Amino acid sequence: MEKLVRIEELSINSLDPNKRALIEQAKQARDSSYAPFSEFYVGCSVLHENGHIGMGSNQENASFPSGLCAERVALFESSKNLEHNKVIEIAIYAESNKYEVPKVLVPCAGCLQVISDIQVRQKSPIKVYMWDGGEVVFCASDVSQFLPFHFELNRK
């Protein structure tokens, strides 16, 4: 078995205004990040098919691992009506004064599973944009680029 990963490398300035706004809203969402332990501040924006954009940021807790990642905060908050309003894209932004932010800012395995589950529930892919604040934005057509085998429960 072989799995090929395809991630597009895009210029932030070449994106249409709506895509750029989604990505910049992920940066804005980072403003509410609470990360006193890792000092790794993450924001996520979630675009729905009706144009609504939900946002979330990582929230750490002194009782590890009780915090939540930005992607899950944004997705859980904004995915209440998936059957009528699918998630079509998410954007992730991070910054840190303590650590180097990866250029390809792949969500953690837990977040990948949540994104994958939402894709299965709504029967459509979710495009993932990843931005470190520089000139380049990375884009994956859906979460299967990072999580080729997801956990799924199917009723008998």
Protein language model features and the residues they cover:
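Short, compositionally biased leader-like segments
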Residues: 1-24, 98
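Short Pro/Gly-enriched beta-strand edge/turn motifs at strand-loop
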Residues: 24-31
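Short beta-strand scaffold segments in enzyme catalytic cores
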Residues: 39-48, 129
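Acidic/polar N-terminal loop/beta-strand segments that form early-domain functional surfaces
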Residues: 47-49, 58-59
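Zn2+-dependent cytidine deaminase-like catalytic core
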Residues: 55-154
